[in-house]
Amino acid sequence: GRQRRHYDLHSAMRPSRLAQFAICPWREGGGAQPDALARLHGLAIDGVLLQRQTSSTFSAMTATLHGAEAFTLELAEGKGEDLQPEVLQFEQGLIAMIEGRELSAGAEAQPQLLCISREIIKRSSRFRLCIPADIENFAPLPIGSLLAEDDGMRWVVDEPEACILFPMADVAEGQRAALIVVPLEQSDR
């Protein structure tokens, strides 16, 4: 039968240590297959965040309801009017896939796999992130560093190899202000 693939494309809102990355929605029966990860690597995707619970993203819906190989993709931040080399490699790889050609990445090649260790949720108007406003996605977080405070609650890094993802102080109360992510192997230790 025909293989359904859905790549929900986004442009990065901030600089990132991983130029391009994907978010793999959780679905019953497991996460991304090795061949899907190899395809992403061939599309210049550096990392894949594997979700461990359901979400309300477009890619989660197409994966669940339509059985699609679905990912949300965060593409490299543009500088001026020029496309980044990673975006051009992504575009060329996507054209090759549409034309039925094989991508150049080997079957064993995979992007870095990550998972969410913790979410930082804004609980009150006193919430503040204690990291630089211009911090890059996937910037490493030293153990013991203070990430956020909110009405007596403190988020302190206790995960080895932790990185920050999607830090946003100006979200509504009850919303996610940041994610702490770790390499997949680290989360299983």
Regions inferred by a protein language model and the residue ranges of each:
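Structured catalytic-domain cores with a bias toward divalent-metal coordination
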Residues: G1-R189
